[in-house]
């Protein structure tokens, strides 16, 4: 029996983790620059998923505001997939309410750019009742 395999190019982007925010920020700028160039050079490259978060766009455009139109084109073309959250889901968000608000803000931000991806990894260690 033949099996079909899907490969989803994506990031797992922590704004800060083992380096200072500024160091991660510059790595993000490099990643986004490389992605936008890849979208232009390789029409066969299908898409890249920004890890379910939209704050990446704010962080990138803070350094490269002149790339706004290219980012918009990539999102509109379905090459750059965004949302549905604002920040990366985290076990340590304060409460379930924080996670819901994170999604609501992320959906609102995503819709400003286009259609959000209705898929994300969610891992919450809070016990169910």
Regions found by a protein language model. Name each.
Residues 119-128:
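Residue-level detector of conserved catalytic or cofactor/ligand-binding positions
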Residues 1-97, 109-111:
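N-terminal catalytic cores of secreted or lumenal carbohydrate-active enzymes
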Residues 106:
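Active-site helix-to-loop segments that bind/position phosphate- or nucleotide-bearing substrates
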Residues 100:
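Glycine-rich phosphate-binding loop at the start of an alpha helix
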Residues 111-119:
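Short, surface-exposed connector motifs at secondary-structure boundaries
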């Amino acid at each position: 029996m033949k099996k079909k395999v899907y490969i989803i190019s994506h990031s797992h982007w922590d704004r800060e983790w083992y380096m200072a925010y500024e160091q991660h920020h510059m790595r993000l700028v490099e990643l986004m620059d490389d992605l936008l160039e890849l979208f232009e050079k390789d029409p066969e490259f299908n898409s890249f998923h920004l890890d379910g978060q939209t704050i990446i766009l704010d962080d990138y455009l803070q350094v490269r505001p002149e790339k706004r139109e290219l980012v918009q084109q990539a999102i509109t073309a379905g090459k750059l997939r965004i949302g549905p959250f604002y920040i990366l889901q985290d076990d340590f968000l304060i409460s379930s309410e924080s996670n819901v608000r994170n999604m609501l803000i992320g959906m609102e931000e995503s819709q400003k750019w286009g259609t959000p991806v209705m898929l994300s990894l969610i891992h919450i260690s809070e016990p169910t009742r």
